[in-house]
Amino acid sequence: MKEGTGMVVRSSEITPERISNMRGGKGEVEMAHLLSKEAMHNKARLFARMKLPPGSSVGLHKHEGEFEIYYILLGEGVFHDNGKDVPIKAGDVCFTDSGESHSIENTGNTDLEFLAVIILL
């Protein structure tokens, strides 16, 4: 992609992948990569829509040299933020800075869906 050019990625072009026990978490997670690292000029390494069924989670992990943002689209759960458990729901934004650890768990009765973005420093 050249500087100044746009791009539209059609939903029909996106194939979600299923990951069991992501980062040591519980159950299965569905991840749909929306843009590649190259499309984001190597300034971000992830832009994805995540879906966690009830009881599923992304395990505790640490970010170094990057930060991660979650924007909660649907459902509810718990964001584990450096040892603190914070209830989350649709419309909330979760931020994890470089050097920090986090995980996310679906504690609700419906799917927890969110956008995940990892920006490189």
Swiss-Prot record:
Residue span(s) of domain Cupin type-2: 49-117
Annotated GO biological process: oxalate metabolic process
GO MF annotations, alphabetized: identical protein binding; manganese ion binding; oxalate decarboxylase activity; protein homodimerization activity
Binding site for Mn(2+): 61, 63, 68, 102
Positions contributing to oxalate binding: 70
Keyword entries, A-Z: Manganese, Metal-binding
Domain of life, source organism: Bacteria
General function of this protein: Binds oxalate.
Protein name: Oxalate-binding protein
